[in-house]
């Protein structure tokens, strides 16, 4: 399936905006890609579309729980299987979510930076078929500083 077909099927748009297509083509060709776009510029589509075009799970690392929940809801509303793991969830909820990523044919797993370093995530990650990793809202890292979250100090 080509990228424009995915865009049309899930978002209802006939064409990409601005540099979206350039970013998508770069990601789709397997290159590490930094996509810088303004708020409301459609950044999420630039990693969601190529992730949908390939098998496997897209791991999305983002520090903002509200954004995670919003993105997951938006994807689910479009019929795309997505799930989030964040603080405030019980261990059982986290295990179920991660196992769903192994066995449940999910396309997107949204996770906070702190969760990357947990034993349960590291263990479950070994069984996941991750095809793509995205860091969303990466500007927050420099805004918060080096000592905001310990995971970034490794």
Annotated model-derived regions:
Residues 30-49, 61:
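Walker A/P-loop
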Residues 51-53, 75-77, 100-104, 123-128:
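Conserved catalytic network of the ASCE P-loop NTPase/AAA+ motor domain
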Residues 121-153:
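SF2 helicase catalytic motif II
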Residues 29-35, 56-57, 105-107:
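Pre-Walker A (Motif I) flank of P-loop NTPase domains
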Residues 59, 65-111:
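Conserved nucleic-acid-binding Ia/Ib motif block in the N-terminal RecA-like helicase ATPase lobe
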Residues 24, 48, 95-98, 122:
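Short hydrophobic/charged patches on amphipathic alpha-helices used for structural packing
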Residues 35, 60, 109-111, 133-134:
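Hydrophobic positions in the central parallel beta-sheet of the AAA+
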Residues 1-38:
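Conserved pre-motif I regulatory segment
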């Amino acid at each position: 399936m080509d990228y424009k077909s995915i865009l049309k099927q899930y978002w209802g748009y006939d064409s990409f905006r601005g540099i979206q297509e350039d970013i998508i083509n770069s990601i789709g060709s397997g290159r590490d890609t930094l996509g810088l776009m303004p708020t409301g510029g459609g950044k999420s589509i630039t990693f969601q579309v190529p992730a949908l075009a390939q098998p496997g799970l897209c791991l999305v690392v983002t520090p903002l729980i509200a954004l995670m929940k919003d993105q997951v809801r938006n994807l689910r509303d479009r019929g795309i299987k997505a799930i989030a793991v964040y603080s405030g969830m019980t261990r059982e909820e986290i295990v179920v979510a991660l196992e769903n990523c192994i066995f449940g044919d999910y396309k997107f797993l949204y996770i906070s930076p702190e969760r990357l370093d947990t034993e349960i995530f590291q263990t479950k990650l070994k069984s996941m078929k991750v095809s793509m990793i995205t860091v969303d809202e990466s500007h927050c890292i420099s805004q918060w500083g080096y000592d905001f979250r310990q995971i970034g100090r490794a």
